[in-house]
């Protein structure tokens, strides 16, 4: 017998029940056995086991493979403004603690499921917030969440100049949501500012384009990994592949590298990287190449180009499990070429931002590339995304970024 609740009831499989009890907040479409009533797309439903035990309440999405995203397992919870105010309060308090006063001004404030706000990402660039809404349920309540963000940041003395929505990602279509981007307009927000803004990270100034830049404009998750690169760059000739707006390259240059070459296939990214180098007085020790890294690395190997530190920070080569074999080949190719380019004693920083390329598979790929390149690797550091992108240990999807720093021996 089901407990009386406030929302339409969804009964789920034993497998899904076990997953929820272990703390994973998703129920997939095939795991819903029965749905009472006709809840609106994106509305709240109560979730029950086959035996009628209440398991939680979450957003339902009829278009998505993730049919229900759990918000809370508290049977006494209400889901009005106070609920979302608490979630934002916890998220901001966590960032103030783990990022500290030097980095809180530019970090991820909300990381979806890891903050109990499924389908929502919010990044802060000084006084501009950039959001992505990736679930139908969050789309319905986003104004409540935005209002709380603006209100609570104002209480900290931070006046938000605008919220830019980067809802131009294909995953929204899987939720039945339109794609688009632009300033969010509301009576609690001023007239929108320019989408080009300035930030400072690790002592380096950047120009960030929140409208047209990759992701939300900048890769905040590599913040402390860039520090790791800067720490060992002194006196070295550095090749930064997939440089985007030059963040790893600039950290290497500021760290004392003799020479830094920044490579990206995008002419726009290269121009932005040059501007950032000029802004920081580092242009004289940097070179910039607009090229495909898969073509450039073999050419550099053939020329016996002189580098002793290579950085590989590619975009995600796969966004699905079924494409993982092709992605693995791509990762291995660039790592193999980098190892062939480097001398013994050289350094390699290599990354993957794909959740589907899990840590075990990534390490196996690196070891395979090392065998083929006839080198051994000494591990210096193994790192993850910065703590403003927290990993929930029972939600593996929140653990996505791998960063390894090796020396070739």
Predicted feature locations:
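C-terminal catalytic and target-recognition region of SAM-dependent MTase-like enzymes
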Residues: 333, 347-409
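Mobile active-site "lid"/loop adjacent to the S-adenosyl-L-methionine
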Residues: 307-337
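Conserved SAM-binding motif I beta-strand of class I
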Residues: 259-264
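Non-catalytic accessory regions of SAM-dependent methyltransferases
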Residues: 1-126
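Conserved class I S-adenosyl-L-methionine
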Residues: 235-244
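Conserved SAM-binding loop of SAM-dependent methyltransferases across substrates and taxa
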Residues: 245-258
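S-adenosyl-L-methionine
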Residues: 268-309
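Non-catalytic substrate-recognition/targeting regions of SAM-dependent transferases
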Residues: 112-123, 143-218
